[in-house]
């Protein structure tokens, strides 16, 4: 992926990984547009990094996604990189009957949102030089967190979708999968300071070094995520599943 001179859209750019990526890509000489639901959060990121632009987007609303895509192309016709970063994660007990509002919202944001936005932008991207599509998935797409089963399932689906997009768009749009480990962000309550999670700055440092490799790897997988990424292929899936879920429950209990 070209490192500078791009026009980059980052969804979920008002905080966490999205905001941190936006700052780094601006520093490399790209024009970056961050998008998200919360105008105040977007404004705060732009205030810290004046080279950014911001646009509100309700990724869950199909009509809003189509309207956003039309406005985005009209205002930023050079758009050639899209980073699907917006995501939500909810803890749930799938072993008992429960309200599915959180599950449905997770699917809408994490899976349907990227599908709709890519559909709205794909014809434009195919016409751009050095076009790239980046999906932010998760280590949990390869070994699920049982207490976040729907989140894990959406990330597994996004991995599969990324593989399909890469094959379908070969020669026209570079498709890259970014696979975070557990990172200190506001994704879940207490996560931003949870011991044992990867500090955000360290994660972004490693990610940007991988993006800079030529050719850019098809999968941006930092060292911490690789044991989960390869667990099934290496015959370690069952033991990794148990260890991951035991550690996650202990970490959440310690933070309460």
Region spans (language model):
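Active-site helix of classical SDR
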Residues: 118, 154
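Conserved mid-core segment of classical short-chain dehydrogenase/reductases
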Residues: 66, 89-104, 147-150
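Conserved glycine-rich cofactor-binding loop
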Residues: 12-16
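Conserved glycine-rich Rossmann-like NAD(P)H-binding loop of the short-chain dehydrogenase/reductase
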Residues: 28-44
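The beta1-alpha1 cofactor-binding region of Rossmann-like NAD(H)/NADP(H)-dependent oxidoreductases
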Residues: 56-68, 100
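Residue(s) in the substrate-gating loop at a strand-loop-helix junction
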Residues: 138
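SDR active-site lid
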Residues: 160, 164-224, 234
């Amino acid at each position: 992926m070209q490192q500078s001179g791009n026009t980059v859209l980052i969804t979920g750019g008002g905080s966490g990984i999205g905001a941190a990526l936006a700052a780094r890509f601006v520093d490399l000489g790209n024009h970056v547009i961050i998008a998200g639901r919360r105008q105040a959060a977007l404004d705060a990121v732009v205030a810290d990094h004046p080279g950014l632009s911001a646009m509100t987007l309700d990724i869950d609303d199909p009509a809003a996604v189509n309207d956003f895509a039309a406005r985005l192309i009209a205002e930023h016709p050079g758009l050639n990189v899209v980073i699907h970063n917006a995501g939500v994660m909810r803890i749930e007990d799938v072993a008992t009957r429960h309200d599915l509002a959180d599950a449905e919202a997770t699917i809408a944001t994490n899976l349907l949102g990227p599908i709709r936005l890519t559909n709205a932008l794909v014809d434009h991207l195919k016409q751009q030089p050095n076009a790239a599509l980046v999906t932010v998935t998760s280590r949990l797409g390869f070994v699920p967190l049982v207490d976040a089963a729907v989140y894990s399932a959406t990330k597994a689906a996004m991995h599969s979708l990324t593989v399909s997009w890469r094959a379908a768009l070969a020669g026209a749009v570079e498709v890259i999968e970014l696979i975070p480990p557990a990172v200190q962000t506001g994704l879940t309550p207490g996560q931003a300071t949870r011991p044992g999670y990867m500090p955000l700055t360290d994660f972004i440092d490693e990610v940007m070094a991988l993006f800079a490799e030529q050719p850019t790897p098809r999968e941006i997988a930092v060292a911490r995520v690789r044991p989960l990424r390869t667990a099934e292929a290496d015959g370690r899936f069952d033991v990794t599943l148990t260890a991951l879920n035991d550690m996650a429950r202990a970490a959440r209990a310690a933070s309460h």
